[in-house]
Every structure is written in C-alpha cells, then in structure tokens.
Amino acid sequence: KYAEALGVQKDELLLSQPDTGEQGLEIADALVQSGAVDIIVVDSVAALVPRAEIEGEMGDSHVGLQARLMSQALRKLAGTLNRTGTIAIFINQIREKIGVMFGN
C-alpha cells in the first residue's frame, strides 16, 4: 500500500531475489539488454554474495571475490546501459568497525 501511495505501479514492477551475486547481475544484464526497463535498482551490493562464497565452507577465505564480481559486472553493464539509455542504481551500506574512529 505504501508503494501505491507513492505512485508505484505494482503491476509494472519487476522484483527478483536471486540466490547468488552472479545470478542477480546476470538478471540485471538481461533486463538492460532487452530494453524492457528504463531503470534498474540493485539493493544492496553487500547482499550480492559470490557463488564461490555460498558454495564454500564456513571460515573459507574469499578475499576480493565480491570486488572482482562487481568490477566485471560493471564493465559488462556500462556499455549496455549507455546503448539502451537505462539508468542503474546500486545501493550499498556503510559498515563500521567497532572501536575505530572516522578516518582510521
């Protein structure tokens, strides 16, 4: 009801909750390439967990996987976004380390 009150046309809204970051970014890429959407919002980048991390064991080190995933996806999406005129918004979250002051 809140979305409707804001003017969101729910029948035209596409919502996806993929299992992995790769899957989510592939869905985003396919939608942009199709030209069927004018704007795409990814909320949140922090929730785009790489497949290797999901399939791995607890405690395994996956240094830089998410950064590589996003870097590759953005390189791939940039041209398509430009060509189709689609707007992409990526929402992330700020995480703080306990006991660390700003700038440290």
From Swiss-Prot:
GO cellular component: cytosol
InterPro entries listed in its UniProt record: DNA_recomb/repair_RecA, P-loop_NTPase, RecA-like_N, RecA_ATP-bd
Source organism, top-level taxon: Bacteria
One biological process term in Gene Ontology: DNA repair
Pfam family, one: RecA
Primary location class: cytoplasm
Record field: transmembrane: none
Subcellular location: Cytoplasm
One Gene Ontology MF term: single-stranded DNA binding
Keyword DNA-binding: yes
Keywords per UniProt: ATP-binding, Cytoplasm, DNA damage, DNA recombination, DNA repair, DNA-binding, Nucleotide-binding, SOS response
Function: Can catalyze the hydrolysis of ATP in the presence of single-stranded DNA, the ATP-dependent uptake of single-stranded DNA by duplex DNA, and the ATP-dependent hybridization of homologous single-stranded DNAs. It interacts with LexA causing its activation and leading to its autocatalytic cleavage.
Family that this chain belongs to: Belongs to the RecA family.
Name the record gives this protein: Protein RecA
Organism in which the protein naturally occurs: Leuconostoc mesenteroides
